[in-house]
């Protein structure tokens, strides 16, 4: 009898710890860090073209009702074709933004977010070289850029602290000599502290 009681207690305790606990998800003032990899969407180019990529690191802080604010530092590189030469476009950007939940499932495991951000940074074109290999002069120049972005993301809880993210972003950059509107797709992981 005593052995059965101890065994039953152990089974109940094991089951309690194996069930997911949602108590520590999305609480106000909770912080998180995310790492994302991205690809720019360029008209007429393949989705995963050579030398077109981006990486970003973000710090987030949850507010009330599952919404959050974020600071995102991002580096992006694009290879713009010119004859048989590629002109490199490199951006280092800092975003300050807000995300608001639009939809979620009943278990609060999958979320669809929408948001906005202000951004600023520096854009470098062709490593600041004015002459191209065919001796043509590049009129576009490197400079500071600023603007805003709209964001959409699907966030899936893998564990109570680890999330998988798929994001879409549409940036509007002022001060740039190249593409003012730049859409981007990204995926990554977030760890909530």
What label would you give each PLM region?
Residues 58-132, 162, 191-193:
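Gram-negative (and chloroplast) outer-membrane scaffold detector with strong preference
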């Amino acid at each position: 009898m005593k052995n059965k009681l101890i065994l039953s207690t152990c089974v109940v305790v094991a089951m309690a710890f194996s069930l997911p606990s949602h108590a520590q998800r999305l609480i106000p003032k909770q912080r998180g860090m995310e790492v994302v990899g991205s690809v720019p969407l360029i008209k007429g180019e393949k989705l995963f073209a050579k030398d077109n990529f981006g990486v970003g690191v973000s710090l987030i802080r949850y507010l009330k009702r599952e919404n959050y604010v974020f600071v995102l530092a991002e580096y992006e590189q694009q290879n713009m074709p010119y004859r048989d030469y590629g002109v490199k476009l490199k951006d280092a950007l800092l975003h300050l933004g807000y995300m608001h939940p639009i939809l979620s499932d009943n278990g609060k495991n999958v979320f669809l977010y929408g948001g906005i951000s202000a951004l600023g940074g520096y854009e470098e074109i062709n490593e600041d070289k004015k002459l191209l290999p065919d001796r043509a002069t590049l009129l576009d120049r490197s400079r500071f850029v600023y603007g805003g972005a709209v964001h959409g993301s699907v966030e899936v809880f893998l564990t109570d602290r680890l999330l998988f993210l798929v994001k879409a972003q549409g940036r509007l950059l002022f001060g740039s000599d190249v593409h003012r509107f730049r859409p981007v797709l990204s995926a990554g992981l977030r760890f909530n502290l």
